[in-house]
Amino acid sequence: LGDVYKRQANNQDELKNLFHKSIRLIGTWAVSLFIIAQLIATPLATLFVGYDQGLFELTRSGFRLYSFTFLINGFNIYGSAFFTALNNGLLSALISFLRTLVFQMAVVLLLPLLLGINGVWCSVAIAELLTLCVTGTFIVLKRNTYHYL
């Protein structure tokens, strides 16, 4: 991706093509992983904590809630890598910093107060969703600079 932008700066069609293919691929994998996670939640929980019904229910429920993260996080990882490839380390670092520290810390402290134990399980997905808003904003704001949309 970086080579397409730097060395072949006039090849905006290829940059757009790579961007759109990447988004489709990430979306396909995200949905696939989410569906697989939902389907294997019961067998996986049984394998690890099948000996305790209460712990089994908590684990299965938690895994199903956490799996919503799989729908989102690939786009954020790609967004950070995308801006790195375009030689915009500042936006890449900002996305990563917000994703891994600021948003996760904020929601893991706040959501359990509002949702109890489910808030803990949902905190990563909510942090990823907040990061997706930031990533999407940067992608829209920089579209005319890099011409990938």
Residue ranges and their predicted role:
Residues 89-91, 101, 107, 118:
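A short pocket-lining beta-strand/turn micro-motif at the edge of beta-sheets
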Residues 1-2, 93:
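Mature extracytoplasmic/luminal segments of secretory-pathway proteins
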Residues 27-29, 73-75, 86, 102-103, ...:
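Short hydrophobic/aromatic segments of transmembrane alpha-helices and their interfaces
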Residues 3-68, 110-149:
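Short alpha-helical transmembrane segments in multi-pass integral membrane proteins
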Residues 34, 71-78, 97-106, 125, ...:
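Hydrophobic alpha-helical transmembrane bundles that constitute the permease/transmembrane domains
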Residues 9, 70-97:
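Membrane-interface junctions at transmembrane-helix termini in multi-pass inner-membrane proteins
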